[in-house]
Amino acid sequence: FGSLLGICLATQIITGLLMAMHYTADTTLAFTSVAHTCRNVQFGWLIRNLHANGASMFFICIYLHIGRGLYYGSYLFKETWNTGVILLLTLMATAFVGYVLPWGQMSFWGATVITNLFSAIPYIGQTIVEWAWGGFSVDNPTLTRFFALHFLLPFIITGLTLVHLTFLHETGSNNPLGIPSECDKIPFHPYFSIKDILGFMAMLLPLMSLAMFSPNLLGDPENFTPANPLVTPLHIKPEWYFLFAYAILRSIPNKLGGVLALAASVLILFLIPFLHKSKQRTMTFRPLSQLMFWILVANLLILTWVGS
């Protein structure tokens, strides 16, 4: 899945650059500039749909990648694992600021709700929120800085990816038995290159089908309405890939408690290398650990479903 994530990143940067050429980061023009891209730019509709659904593929791949890492004990490469978790956090930040850019209803209210969470931080919270907003509400300054961040972060992700790979190359990669594989090393090309191409095909087919046939399947219809600070949507919810965390946030009545639980649901990944107590690295021959792992997966799926 690592190679797929690399392809996702490249695709997102290319489509994103093409979209940035036609986008205007201004509250009065953002929504119409996106509509203009879809209507009047050559293949603008395709570029936008690939960019929007490419984000979904990115998250599918990264969640599978993390799940695989948990299952096979890859977290024992501590540096690789920690840079990976930082990559996940950066990706989440990028997806969040990007979702705000079309300046539809859900963009605006999503930005309002999520940035507002920082006000739960004792003493300095309110100051941080107003500083992030650039005013007393989500407005033009917020949009322009979010565009700047959304442009910058993917390049930070690219840099972190190189760090991630550098650390991985220190140890070499893991395998399903969790045993040294020095004697099984084979040339990257043609073996791994062909294997990776199979993966790209398997990912590109659903992505293309999604972008061509039902590009709005995963989006929120509210976002077809231009942002209006005076009208709150009935159900404010993020894109599907954040629903598990959003469900955790909403299930706790206390604001600070919810924010801490939300943060913990992702940051817990940093602790995993310290929680490994088994003599075996992978879960291949550990049925009880497997049971716990699949309960975790089911739990996340249920949270995602409940969150919507």
Swiss-Prot record:
GO terms for biological process: mitochondrial electron transport, ubiquinol to cytochrome c. It is a multi-pass membrane protein. It is found in: Mitochondrion inner membrane. Gene3D superfamilies: Cytochrome Bc1 Complex, Chain C. Keywords: Electron transport, Heme, Iron, Membrane, Metal-binding, Mitochondrion, Mitochondrion inner membrane, Respiratory chain, Transmembrane, Transmembrane helix, Transport, Ubiquinone. Binds 2 heme b groups non-covalently. Heme b b562 binds at residues 51, 150. Its cofactor is heme b. A ubiquinone binds at residue 169. Belongs to the cytochrome b family. Component of the ubiquinol-cytochrome c reductase complex (complex III or cytochrome b-c1 complex) that is part of the mitochondrial respiratory chain. The b-c1 complex mediates electron transfer from ubiquinol to cytochrome c. Contributes to the generation of a proton gradient across the mitochondrial membrane that is then used for ATP synthesis. The cytochrome bc1 complex contains 11 subunits: 3 respiratory subunits (MT-CYB, CYC1 and UQCRFS1), 2 core proteins (UQCRC1 and UQCRC2) and 6 low-molecular weight proteins (UQCRH/QCR6, UQCRB/QCR7, UQCRQ/QCR8, UQCR10/QCR9, UQCR11/QCR10 and a cleavage product of UQCRFS1). This cytochrome bc1 complex then forms a dimer. This is Cytochrome b. It comes from Scytalopus magellanicus.
